[in-house]
Swiss-Prot record:
Identification of the protein by name: Uncharacterized lipoprotein RC0077
Organism: Rickettsia conorii (strain ATCC VR-613 / Malish 7)
Region described as Disordered: 107-127
Coiled coil: 56-101
Highest taxon listed in the record's lineage: Bacteria
Classification lineage: Bacteria, Pseudomonadati, Pseudomonadota, Alphaproteobacteria, Rickettsiales
Keyword ATP-binding annotated: no
Length: 127
């Protein structure tokens, strides 16, 4: 179980780190070597940490994950029992929620940028 977790983390880290660590001049070999070292260090650190977890806690976590899988399966079954019209409505509703969250993030970022700009203008005015 722990090996699967470690392997999953390693894959995620290696793909994201590799994408972020490649340089613009194309020195992918150096980036890959650095990435491999970083990934291996993280895996070793996690293995050391996972070794300190009590067996009772591991069992508890495993039961939790099994329960989550059952819940997600039940959710899929419930969704599949809905009429096509209801499924389409939920899909459209999700699109609108995404638009709202993107819109909200844009507004928040604009407000932060405007606040930063106004603070910059104040400091320029006092000079």
């Amino acid at each position: 179980m722990i090996k699967k977790i470690i392997f999953g983390i390693a894959i995620l880290l290696s793909t994201s780190c590799f994408a972020n660590s490649t340089t613009s001049d194309g020195s992918k070999k150096d980036a890959a070597k650095t990435n491999d070292i970083t990934t291996q260090k993280i895996i070793d650190d996690f293995s050391a940490y996972a070794g300190t977890i009590k067996p009772e806690v591991r069992e508890e976590i495993q039961k939790y994950r099994v329960a989550i899988v059952k819940i997600n399966k039940k959710k899929r079954e419930l969704y599949n029992r809905l009429s096509k019209e209801a499924q389409n409505f939920l899909a459209e509703q999700q699109k609108y929620k995404q638009k709202l969250s993107i819109s909200k993030l844009t507004v928040e970022n604009d407000q932060k940028n405007n606040t930063a700009d106004s603070n910059d203008n104040k400091s320029k005015d006092t000079k």
